[in-house]
Amino acid sequence: MSDYIHHRGSEWRKWDLHAHTPLDTEWISRPPLRTESERKLFAEQYVKTATTAGLAVIAITDHNFCSNRDELLIPYVQQAATPLGLTVLPGFEVAVSDCGGTHVLVIFSELSSLDIIDEVMSQLFPPGTARFQGKEVLPSARGIEELHEILRQSGLSYLIAFAHADRENGALDQRGGALRSRLWKQPFVRIAQLSKPPSECTGFVASVVNGTSSHYSRDIAYVIASDCRSLEPGTPAQERYSLGERCTWIKADPTFEGLRQIVFEPNDRTCFQEHKPEEKPPFLTIDQVRFLDSSGKFQRDPIPLNPNLVTIIGGKSTGKSILLSCIARAIDAEQAEAATEIAKTNLYDLGTLDFEVMWSNGDVDRLSENEVRHRVTFLPQMYIHRLVEQENRPSLSESLLSFLRQNGTFEARYRKLINERDAVMTELATEISNFFSLLSSWRDVVTKSKELGDKSSIEAELNRIAEKSEELRKASGFTDEETEQYRKIQQSLLSANAGFRTAQRVEASMRTVVAEVPAVIQDTLAKIDDVVAEATDFHGLEETETQQLRSHVVKLKQAIEAANAIFAEDTSKRIVKLTDGTKAASKAVEAFNSALKPFLDKIANQKELREHQESTKQLSSVLEGINGYEKEKTQIEQKYGASVEAVERLVSDRFATQERLIELFNEPTYTNLGDDIVISADMMFEKDRFESDFLGCFDLRHSASWLGSHFRDNSIAWHPEEHVKIITSALRKLIEMPEDKLRLRAGQKLRNAVDLLLRDYLSHSFSVKQTGEDIFRMSPGKQGLILLEIFLHLSNSAYPVLIDQPEDNIDNRTIYSHLVRYIRRRKVDRQIIMVTHNPNLVLGADAEQVIVANQDGEGKGENAEYRFEYVSGGIECSFTNSQAGSLLQSKGIREHVCHVLEGGEDAFRKREEKYCLT
């Protein structure tokens, strides 16, 4: 039969370590206990009261144990408690002779012989002396040191505690002299019961508890207990309560060995509050894991996990790292593979094996599903040390930035700057498109203008025709007055024709606008609705909150629709006026043609005149087209120049934003982490990518120095203070050079080159310094320690962290003085699952759970059924079982730690020697 019962290890449970039974002379309403059945009935009521109160352990400590061994109720209570999982520790309360009769408790192992306990009690009184006189409990004639010696010689496992230390007959009942101080400092008394939680103590007792009283300063575990004299809740009398009404939360197995842990960890293993301590959100802790394997290679039973510190130990190649990596891969395979790649370790080939992770809220992740629903930090073996290698520095920077972003104020400022940079990049992309659109339009206008002909040649031809027409007019005998009239009418006709064409264009444009605006308005209104819907979904608004948002947007839409209605009405009126204007301009042309006709009729050679008129009309139209294109070309060139300037401004803005990011990354408020550790950041330019992307556009058999003085030997000499100048100067060179002279590689165009030039090649590189020493110049051990401190101790992340052998390259002294301290602090807020070979990380960090792994290699028959098997429990789980069916089941966690971990036995011994409990 397996002795592994509490697989999840040390958990918080309620303990009442000072309880009495009706054998106590002060018991209220003593029930009948004469017969066996009456004792059993009371024991059942006693246990029911304890379990209803949520107790996991009670210590029955009746005064002087009992007057008659046969009347003892402890066996009956233990018998009733066992099926319900309630542990009953036997013990007694006795008044030792020190300081006028100080009460102490002695608590024994649940496996202790009650007969031997009774014999111990007998030795505390002179032979033949009674323990009671009527209802009076008699004090022992022995002092506390004599009590300790008698207990030591009994061979029993025991703990001595000061009973109700701050009350009458307690060790701290009154401020005393050297004798009371000496009594309080007895090294073999490691527990003191108080009437109230330590934080509520006042006066002298508070000075003792807080360690400010020099005469009473010592390490001791404090507990509170009921000191019950009844099973029924009522008015506490003399600081006594009903069973379970006052108790202590203790983080340990519900066993005597579990109780011993509060001696070693007096501050971290006890707690005084109503609800269970150290409760983490259930979606942030893993409840259990299991291999889904039908091949017989891995055990199929689930492995429960403690929500605090879980350590995985075992010999070489026993499946420790396999278990850890399977957890990581089932939760986030991509992250696990990326971390493993950095660490340069190999992932175990799982073949068809599946793996399941169940979270405390009931969620399940499976390796086969490859769906990321939860977060976890995975630090495989050597990952921390590989991070500082040159090739992995981007990953280090990413990790350090993630750490900084856990600060809410930093994150808000960071997001603001990133949004600004993104806005600049969006605007830059738009401006580049606008720039090339203008360039295309300019080329189109130039081409069309050239197709119409040469402007100077057309103007010369018009002058020649005008001279010929003038000769015809003179030959027709026009008077000076007719000549002047003729010229005026001709000039007016030219103006009227120009006005008519303008009126036609404006009217046509207005009709186009009127036809297309309604669709644009409807599209805009629809997009506004889309924005509202996206904002509602993104922020998870409730219906009432959504209505508030919509009420504001409705007003905007109504304003747009009202403005559109006014615009439609105004433009309708305007079109009527424009139509009238076009008709008037047409009539003016007709009028001037009519006025000109009499003069034209007088010219003798009408055929030649008509030819001149037709040529003049055609050439004037062509010239007007050329002038229009020239005007359009000038406008495009102005916009083109403005676009280039806008691009240059955006390049400058982008650089300024990056500078502000670097300033944020170096702000002491966020980067001074304590312990003289400082995170710093420098601006970086991705030179290799720039040369590959941008310079790769060109035929580099020719020098790229024409792009500027910073381009030498087909490479770039980058300096942060020159960044904007380098990019903008190269841009000017590109766009001013005829495209056929750029020597672009086949398939490349000017647009490609500009796009690649204007990409964002700016980045940042983080580093860490301690007392001015850069992490990249530290020893591997110091590098690992600092990064572990950042990622584990200083991080605000609450999701689980999985670490494989963090002790690599770190000496034992540093592990104990630093790494253990980090882990102890963080395990309270964050589940830590850690593979280790170092006993200090198991015992020093006070691991709540130890998982022992074993591989049955080469058919040795060490395992019960599978090639890879695991057992788990708390470090207080201690036993040997030579009849067990496997190596793992043959001993407890303590024994496995001593066997598997080098120095494990010494670590246990030092832990206990510290408290004189060896």
Where are the regions a protein language model picked out?
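Charged catalytic cores and adjacent phosphate/nucleic-acid-binding surfaces used
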Residues: 1-49, 53-55, 67-89, 94-115, ...
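Phosphate-binding glycine-rich loops of NTP-binding sites
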Residues: 58-61, 306-340, 784-793, 838, ...
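Pre-NBD coupling/linker segments of ABC/ABC-like ATPases
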Residues: 220-221, 243-290, 697-698, 703, ...
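Conserved ABC ATPase signature
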Residues: 304-308, 312-319, 380, 766-790, ...
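Flexible phosphate/Mg2+-sensing switch loops adjacent to catalytic phosphate-binding sites
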Residues: 331-369, 640, 644, 648-668, ...
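C-terminal lobe/lid and adjacent interdomain/linker elements of RecA-like ASCE P-loop ATPase modules
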Residues: 347-350, 370-374, 396-405, 816-918
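Extended, charged alpha-helical "arm/stalk" segments used for dimerization and assembly
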Residues: 363-447
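Extended, charged coiled-coil "arm/hinge" scaffolds of SMC/Rad50-like chromosome-maintenance ATPases
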Residues: 444, 448, 452, 459-777, ...
